[in-house]
Structures are given as C-alpha cells and as structure tokens.
Amino acid sequence: MNKIDKNFSNQIIDEQRIDVWLFRSRLIKSRAKAQRVIHEGCIKINKIRTSKTSVKIRVGDIITLSKLDNVSIISVEDFAKRRLNAKEALKLYKEIKII
C-alpha cells in the first residue's frame, strides 16, 4: 500500500494563490512579505507581471521572481497544504534559471 504524504496536494489542489504558494514553498519568508513583493511588481506569472496577491497559479506555471539584483525563474511543480521544511519545499518547484 502506498503511503500518501499529507503535506503535499497530490494534485487534489489544482490551483493556489501566488502569495500562499510563495510562502509555503519558502521562496519568501512570510506571507506578508510575499504580498508586499507582489504589490511591488516583482513577480511575473507566465511572463505577465502581476500586482494582485489573489492570482491563482497552476502546476506548470513559470514564475519570475525579481529580488534586488537577483532574478529567479522557476516552474511550479506541486502545491502544499501547509508551510514545509526546507527539504520538502524543494519538491514544490524546479529552478529553471537564476540570473
């Protein structure tokens, strides 16, 4: 019998708010900071800049995160039901490029 990890969505969740996902994936330290970064226009979803924290993302979406001098391009791989530890959070995304 397969053991199902209750921390991951296992595709039951087909979309999630961008601010929640950024926080749960540990790309940003707090949800409030994630919301601030989004409002400042530092996030693109599939090459479209967004300033709305309520935008829903799906598996396969490409997120561009601009922080100071760094630009990270990542692919959404999964969702989590809660904030994960650092090792587990790496399963939520795949880094495509860091500039």
Task: Annotate each language-model stretch with its function.
Residues 32:
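Key DNA-contact positions within bacterial/archaeal DNA-binding proteins
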Residues 41:
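Glycine-centered, phosphate/nucleic-acid-interacting loop/turn motifs that mediate DNA/RNA or nucleotide
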Residues 1-20, 24, 36, 44-99:
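Strongly charged
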